[in-house]
A protein has these predicted regions:
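Hydrophobic alpha-helical transmembrane segments in integral membrane proteins
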Residues: 388-413, 420
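Short coil loop/turn residues that delineate tetratricopeptide repeat
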Residues: 417-418, 451, 485, 519, ...
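Central hydrophobic cores of alpha-helical transmembrane segments in multi-pass inner-membrane proteins
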Residues: 61-80, 128-134
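Conserved alpha-helical positions within TPR/SEL1-like repeat arrays
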Residues: 420-430, 454-464, 488-498, 522-529, ...
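Structural signature of tandem alpha-helical TPR/SEL1-like repeats
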Residues: 400-412, 431-444, 454, 465-478, ...
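Internal/C-terminal transmembrane anchor helices
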Residues: 231-234, 370-399
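Membrane-interface helix-loop-helix junctions at boundaries between adjacent transmembrane segments
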Residues: 107-197
Length: 645
């Protein structure tokens, strides 16, 4: 929940009439506030430490991003469309914003345009910091603290420290710059980036000093701000910094802060909507049903949140590219709507909001004033924070696309500190076959993060590409010590061991790879190829059959299985798989040639001639097919000498 967004002014309207400060410092009570709002990070860190012992960072991130990040959009949506008075007040926003954002997000993901990702990121950071600022305003309202300087310094603290944590995070900054350059954005010189980082850090220190001086001054003169608010600021900002800069895996960091944000949001929205339902008889239907005072309905509330978030979870696991793009557009539109709606439906400065939170005072409405109507100002804000930047990013990407290697080189120049930029640059170089440079970048990445198992594996692959097998082995051993249950790493190491002739060890790692990745067609296919080299034909055939169960449209698996069955003497079985391979890939010349040999073995010479001829039509330089065609034609001439004259 936030008081402000890109669509509202960073100020709070003074309450009126003035009331005596309330002595209650808490929104609920001391222990519940500490658990749900202030001390939540202290509980989340050990919980996530235990979770990482069971699940990978990627699994934790996907689960939280789905059921938490998207799921917590639902309560705001229920209020937007279930509160009749609110809907009437902002009807056109609630009608047109979803249609507009869904169309834009779907279009951007359909055509793989990255600009929308930057918009979501910046809106998301703003949304997170404004939720913290919103809680500051609520806690100060509890003690009757409404002076302008206090709220402005609170706002400045939230903005500057959230921005500083991102600017000084090598992962966050490099990822943001990478997306920006992926959109074709102009190069930002390293001096600009580095001076900007120094400036924002100095600004954060200066604002903190001003905040502390003001707090002490107010305390001395007897106008004491709520100390719980100060504790909230400290824990929120410190936790945001920890999640962006100090966690071992950034995915875990993102998930950690998301859960903190969601717990705060969901609990406060439950309290607000429940009070709203009790005090406003005009609210009916689904919103009244869900937010009645009933312990069992809390379970329903959580269940609805998880059900809404399941859309994002399904999207993360769906395999169909078209459906994935559509669902990603839907999830992104929901995210932006959540950020947008929270900018105006939860303004604590308005009397109705305060009453539902147990606060006094406030204003009936907010008149922005000015020379232009409110809807014009609102449209200008949309243009400033969405339409114009997104339009520029779209234009750059469609007209000024930058090659990946160049992009990553720019990112490394801007952010030379940190493992991620060097790793991404190395990956881009490796794709281009520039292995010497890739190896150097991987080594730099490992200097910053020696425990990056993926970097060790990628370096081993690059060294293998240089035929430096002995140098690659220690990196694979390190990667597997760090992540012993990573099936992909076992597969890479098995392939490496196979190449240096350590077949007994390779067999163990191939078996581990297929055990840890039982649904990976590639793992089973690689293991099958290994078994073929050992002459274990029955096991080889069984693995290929498993591959085709997992991926029926795998022409090379069909081809190899057909060859194995052919060698075993199962001609009819081989024929079926040759034909299946050709249905999947009609240009697979080897399949035509081998099917021709099968027909030749069966004495179906005319059919063999057809297959060899087709192989030569597709590849006129296919010598084996040419020789086989001559053999078939000679056999045909012996059978039908008159026809050959």
């Amino acid at each position: 929940m936030q008081i402000l967004s890109a669509f509202s002014r960073p100020q709070t309207v003074p309450v009126g009439p003035a009331t005596a400060p309330r002595k209650n410092l808490w929104i609920l009570d001391s222990w519940r506030d500490l658990i749900l709002y202030v001390g939540t990070p202290l509980l989340l860190v050990p919980v996530f430490a235990l979770a990482q012992a069971r699940w990978s960072p990627q699994d934790i991130y996907l689960f939280v991003a789905a059921f938490g990040a998207m799921g917590h959009h639902l309560p705001g949506m229920i209020r937007a469309y279930g509160d009749r008075a609110l809907f009437e007040r902002f009807k056109w926003r609630f009608v047109f914003a979803p249609l507009f954002l869904l169309a834009v997000c779907s279009a951007f993901f359909w055509w793989d345009l990255k600009g929308i990702l930057l918009i979501v990121f910046f809106w998301g950071v703003w949304h997170g910091l404004m939720q913290t600022y919103g809680f500051c305003r609520i806690y100060d309202a509890k003690t009757g603290t409404f002076d302008a300087l206090t709220r402005r310094l609170d706002f400045a603290m939230c903005v500057i420290w959230f921005a500083t944590a991102v600017a000084l995070s090598p992962y966050r900054l490099s990822d943001t710059l990478d997306t920006y350059y992926m959109c074709g954005g102009p190069f930002i010189p390293p001096t600009v980036v580095h001076h900007g980082q120094q400036l924002i850090l100095l600004a954060a220190i200066a604002v903190s000093v001003l905040f502390l001086v003001h707090f002490l001054r107010m305390w001395i003169i007897g106008h004491r701000p709520n100390p719980v608010k100060v504790a909230l600021l400290i824990t929120s900002i410190a936790f945001w910094w920890y999640c962006n800069n100090l966690v071992a895996n950034i995915l875990v960091g993102i998930a950690l802060f998301e859960v903190f944000h969601d717990v705060q949001y969901l609990s406060l929205v439950w309290i607000y909507n429940r009070n709203r339902v009790e005090k406003d008889s005009n609210i009916g239907g689904f919103m009244r049903f869900v937010f009645r005072r009933s312990g069992s309905l809390i379970g329903l509330y959580v269940g609805l949140v998880l059900a809404y978030g399941s859309v994002s979870y399904i999207n993360a696991h769906i395999g169909m590219d078209t459906m994935k793009r559509i669902l990603t557009g839907l999830v992104t539109a929901s995210t932006l709507l959540h950020f947008y709606y929270d900018g105006f439906i939860w303004k604590v400065r308005e009397r109705s909001r305060r009453q539902s939170l147990g606060l006094a005072g406030g204003t009936a409405d907010v008149n922005l004033g000015g020379m232009l109507p409110g809807w014009v100002w609102h449209g200008l804000k949309w243009a400033a924070v969405f339409v114009l930047p997104l339009g520029a990013l779209w234009f750059w990407q469609t007209h000024l696309a930058i090659p990946e290697v160049q992009r990553q080189a720019w990112v490394v120049a801007d952010v030379p500190v940190g493992a991620k930029p060097h790793f991404d640059y190395a990956s881009a170089l490796q794709k281009e076959g520039r292995l010497d440079e890739a190896v150097e970048q991987y080594k730099l990445a490992l200097q910053f993060n020696p425990k990056d198992a993926k970097a060790h594996t990628s370096l081993a692959v690059a060294l293998t590409g240089q035929s430096k097998f002995d140098a690659a082995v220690p990196h694979m051993e390190t990667a597997l010590r760090l992540e012993p249950n990573n099936g992909e790493f076992h597969l890479v190491y098995a392939t490496l061991l196979q190449r240096i002739g350590h077949n007994d060890e390779a067999a163990l790692h191939f078996e581990a790879a297929t055990r840890l990745k039982p649904d990976s067609a590639d793992a089973h296919y690689s293991y099958a190829a290994f078994l073929a080299g050992l002459g274990k034909n029955d096991e080889y055939i069984a693995e290929l059959q498993r591959v085709l169960q997992l991926r029926p449209d795998y022409p090379y698996a069909e081809l190899r299985l057909a060859d194995a069955l052919f060698a075993k003497g199962d001609l009819e079985g081989a024929k079926l798989h040759y034909l299946a391979a050709l249905r999947t890939d009609p240009k697979l010349t080897v399949a035509y040639n081998n099917l021709g040999k099968l027909y030749l073995t069966q004495g179906q010479i005319s059919q063999a001639v057809v297959q060899f001829s087709e192989a030569l039509r597709l590849n006129p330089n296919y010598k084996e097919a040419e020789e086989n065609l001559h053999t078939a034609q000679a056999a045909d001439a012996q059978l039908f000498p008159a026809a050959s004259r």
